[in-house]
Amino acid sequence: SLDAISNGRLELGVGLGWQQEEYEASGIAFENRTKIFWETLAICQSLWEGGPISHQGEMFTFNNIWCQPTPAQGRDLPLLFGVKMTESNAQKIAKVGHGWIPIKTSREFISEGKIILDQAFKDEGRTDSPRIRGQLPTCLDSNGIPSVDLTLKELEKSMDAGLEEIEVFPINFAQSPEHLREVLESIAEIKK
């Protein structure tokens, strides 16, 4: 397990996917994806506690299965969900997860989702706050090229909307290998 090798530093981002063709290529009925996802996640969390485990569910049935080595964090491996925030998804995340990775970068989308997820955490009796990790909206310069500097200017607004952890992918901005260093230096400045 990657979590065991990294001494408990793994954080797992999970989601259902939206492309029906991907499911069809795998021989999985698209309409069953939600059931499969949540049942699979429950199975994984049980396996992470140690085994063997047996499971008789709607989608899967098995007996005496092991997962070794178990994650250093056990069942509490941080789970961040890349889903559209709905009350149903928020309730499920509040039961088993740690946070949300918004699938859109708009501040309105993030803010509305945060309100729903915060309420679900309260309803579940949790005292911790959900983690919200996402990207800034990519801003283009006057030539239509993605600009790291303009994008980073959106940081405060996105954090005000509810993002607490920001992911910046240099590949979105570096126009050449030579440009990569400049992009990385701009990103490094936000830590100061």
Regions from the language model: what does each represent?
Residues 1-192:
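Active-site-adjacent structural elements that line small-molecule/cofactor binding pockets in enzymes
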